Design a protein with these regions (language model features):
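Dinucleotide-binding Rossmann-like beta1-alpha1 core, especially the glycine-rich loop
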Residues: 46-129
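Helical element adjacent to the flavin cofactor pocket in flavoenzyme catalytic cores
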Residues: 131-188, 192-202
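Hydrophobic anchor at the start of a short beta-strand
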Residues: 26-28, 113, 189
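Glycine-rich FAD pyrophosphate-binding loop
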Residues: 22-44
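Central helical "cap/lid" subdomain
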Residues: 38, 182-235, 245-250, 262, ...
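N-terminal Rossmann-like FAD-binding beta1-loop-alpha1 element of flavoenzymes
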Residues: 3-29
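Short beta-strand to alpha-helix junction loop
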Residues: 56, 90-99, 130-149, 283
Length: 283
């Protein structure tokens, strides 16, 4: 079969590209290795819609984050959880950024940073500053349903699940992709596989990116009433974040120190658990 675009990966970026190209009348094929969309990075993360607060040593990154924050909110506001206080704090110990520096950074980036008493959230002396900020979380399942509804209305867009590319080759001016029992061609191939990018590079004979892979655990939990409408992120070092997880009613708990369990610097991620689980680590 011949298409205008072949997209590898049915996460947020893959389905976004499919919806945009399909709405423009192009014939699109999406190949997803998993049995459903949004099963990896789009869902397995903090669900934080970044405003730029994480980047006090890069104004350009912070400003770009703030710009795309507003764009994401405008386009996908229906999947956001916005009704909570997002608090950033700077630790008084082992932090690369203190309260005064964080204030200056936010002012220069043009993002909200309103002082609140650190003792409202932390034991005395632990943090030298705490700030009310503007940041939201998104619900991946709500966003997934929206994309699938939009794509279902586009007969020129096809999604094949449980189809991992086995072979990619040039066929004249087109790319020929074989995935299981399917072979398709298109003049344009989009790799939207995120952490799977080097798998695709290997099929193409391209050099791999130097990627650090981490096997991470994100804890989803219920919190007491005092924290239900609060998110807390402690900067700027080996600290933690506790924040609402989309519209689920749960909070995610992550730690710079304890969330990553293992690290791989191989071109394609390799972890000991893969040998016991058919190549894919599971909880």
């Amino acid at each position: 079969m011949t298409y205008d675009k072949i997209i590898l990966g049915a996460g947020l970026y893959g389905l976004y590209a499919a919806q945009k190209c399909g709405a423009a009348g192009q014939r699109v094929l999406v190949l997803e290795r998993d049995p459903a969309p949004f099963m990896r990075a789009t869902y397995i993360n903090q669900a934080r819609v970044h405003m730029g607060y994480h980047y006090p040593r890069s104004y350009s990154t912070a400003i770009k984050s703030a710009h795309y924050f507003e764009r994401f909110c405008a386009d996908y506001g229906f999947c956001l959880h916005t009704e909570f206080d997002q608090v950033y704090a700077t630790s008084a110990h082992f932090s690369w950024t203190n309260a005064a520096e964080f204030r200056r950074f936010c002012a220069a980036a043009g993002i909200r940073c309103d002082d609140v008493a650190p003792e409202r959230y932390f034991n005395p002396g632990l943090c030298d500053g705490a700030f009310l900020t503007k940041e939201y979380t998104y619900d991946a399942q709500v966003l997934k349903r929206w994309f699938l509804e939009k794509l279902a209305a586009l007969p020129n867009v096809e999604i094949l699940y449980s189809h991992k590319p086995d072979k990619i080759e040039k066929a004249g001016s087109a790319w020929r992709v074989t995935a299981g029992d399917t072979t398709a061609e298109a003049p344009y191939l989009l790799n939207a596989t995120y952490a799977g990018v080097n798998d695709v590079h290997a099929l193409l004979g391209l050099p791999p990116f130097g990627i650090k892979y981490e096997k991470c655990e994100i804890i989803l939990c219920t919190v007491e009433d005092a924290l239900k409408h609060t998110g807390i992120t402690v900067m700027d070092g080996p600290f933690f974040s506790l924040m609402p997880f989309g519209q689920t009613g749960l909070h995610s708990l992550t730690s710079v120190t304890f969330t990553p369990h293992e690290t791989s610097y191989d071109s394609v991620a390799t972890f000991p658990c893969q040998a016991e689980s058919g190549g894919c680590c599971t909880p």
